[in-house]
Amino acid sequence: MALSKISPTEGSRRILEDHHIDEDVGFALPHPLVELPDAYSPWVLVARNLPVLIENGQLREEVEKLPTLSTDGLRGHRLQRLAHLALGYITMAYVWNRGDDDVRKVLPRNIAVPYCELSEKLGLPPILSYADCVLANWKKKDPNGPMTYENMDILFSFPGGDCDKGFFLVSLLVEIAASPAIKAIPTVSSAVERQDLKALEKALHDIATSLEKAKEIFKRMRDFVDPDTFFHVLRIYLSGWKCSSKLPEGLLYEGVWDTPKMFSGGSAGQSSIFQSLDVLLGIKHEAGKESPAEFLQEMREYMPPAHRNFLFFLESAPPVREFVISRHNEDLTKAYNECVNGLVSVRKFHLAIVDTYIMKPSKKKPTDGDKSEEPSNVESRGTGGTNPMTFLRSVKDTTEKALLSWP
């Protein structure tokens, strides 16, 4: 789209609209549906009762009894996202069950076939991803009330009490707090194209302010998520079957593929926010085999296609970093660095969160009730399949190196 042929404001609005980025909630799914048609009530009945079914040892039996339902009655993006979310929950619960060594290597065809059909329609993988459990897994208790933790809930739950509610909703609220930064991105690109230094400086400042607000929301994770419950219970259900010691060959989707497939579990790397800002600011992460850059590139396949395309759009936009350097303007350089420092600050806090919720619990002596793997295994892998501390340190360090010196 040639931004010069239309007003900057209209151009920015169209870019966001074209890439399914909402004015109010950013990359999150606006107004998710909460009910499936009656024909799909068997899925809903299981998905809404996972903790009880797992505790009673009935989960797998109930899943195996489910009828094979056609996805033809699921028309419209939001309805398909809700069904994909429900089947994602059921799949994770079926594979991991109580989180012990009793892991299923085959997903029955009555779930696998409709799940993979929906995945193909949506352009998402057949595993519970960030796009499902964070971006599409919410509702307001009072529809006319505010978008606050106290007025929100998730649609489905895993064992662990309110741990997943806290984890998913705080992650969602971080997305929403950062949405003004995403809304400012087309303005940044337009300002660079028009060589409008004042507009660019203001847009960069807006991004930095939004990141600071997102970090403040991120801090609430500690208010609502217990580290031991997250590590020993919830983390299991978010784990995927790529680089998995318990599913080294992946998961067989019966009736869909003849061989097992590997997919990563939900990861913050699947959020489009920070990848968008990296691309915008020209932050290049360490490349090579099994590198942060390779992992982040792979995580794009877990994003909704429109959001993935937004990253491609940004990669073809005028380079902001080079423009700022070429202007030799102190205020503009400070505004750029303000954005970079905002990203560094969020990433430093993310490191602290990983330390609290993964590293420290992993070093505690396991009790008989613990469901997690031995510490030697968990320390080297997060739910997305990477070593979370090594990955985040590298990403944070690379971000810091992007700061521009002045004069």
From Swiss-Prot:
Heme b binds at H350. Pfam families: IDO (PF01231). Activity is inhibited by and MTH-trp (methylthiohydantoin-DL-tryptophan), modestly inhibited by L-1MT (1-methyl-L-tryptophan) but not D-1MT (1-methyl-D-tryptophan). PROSITE patterns: IDO_1, IDO_2. Residues 362-407 are annotated as: Disordered. Keywords: Cytoplasm, Dioxygenase, Heme, Immunity, Iron, Metal-binding, Oxidoreductase, Tryptophan catabolism. It catalyses: D-tryptophan + O2 = N-formyl-D-kynurenine; L-tryptophan + O2 = N-formyl-L-kynurenine. Highly expressed in epididymis, duodemum, jejunum, ileum, colon and spleen. Highly expressed in epididymis, prostate, duodemum, jejunum, ileum, colon and spleen, not detected in the liver (at protein level). Expressed in tumors only upon exposure to IFN gamma. Constitutively expressed in placenta in trophoblast cells. Expression is restricted to perinuclear regions of primary trophoblast giant cells (TGCs) of fetal origin at mid-gestation (10.5 dpc). After placentation (14 dpc), no IDO expression was detected at the maternal-fetal interface. Disruption phenotype: Knockout mice display normal development and function of dendritic cells, on T- or B-cells development. They display increased sensitivity to the induction of inflammatory and autoimmune reactions. They produce litters of normal sizes at normal rates, implying that compensatory or redundant immunosuppressive mechanisms protected allogeneic fetuses during gestation in knockout mice. Knockout mice display cardiac and gastrointestinal liabilities. Residues 365-374 have a biased composition (Basic and acidic residues). Gene3D superfamilies: 1.20.58.480. One of its GO terms (molecular function) is heme binding. Catalyzes the first and rate limiting step of the catabolism of the essential amino acid tryptophan along the kynurenine pathway. Involved in the peripheral immune tolerance, contributing to maintain homeostasis by preventing autoimmunity or immunopathology that would result from uncontrolled and overreacting immune responses. Tryptophan shortage inhibits T lymphocytes division and accumulation of tryptophan catabolites induces T-cell apoptosis and differentiation of regulatory T-cells. Acts as a suppressor of anti-tumor immunity. Monomer. This is Indoleamine 2,3-dioxygenase 1. It comes from Mus musculus (Mouse).
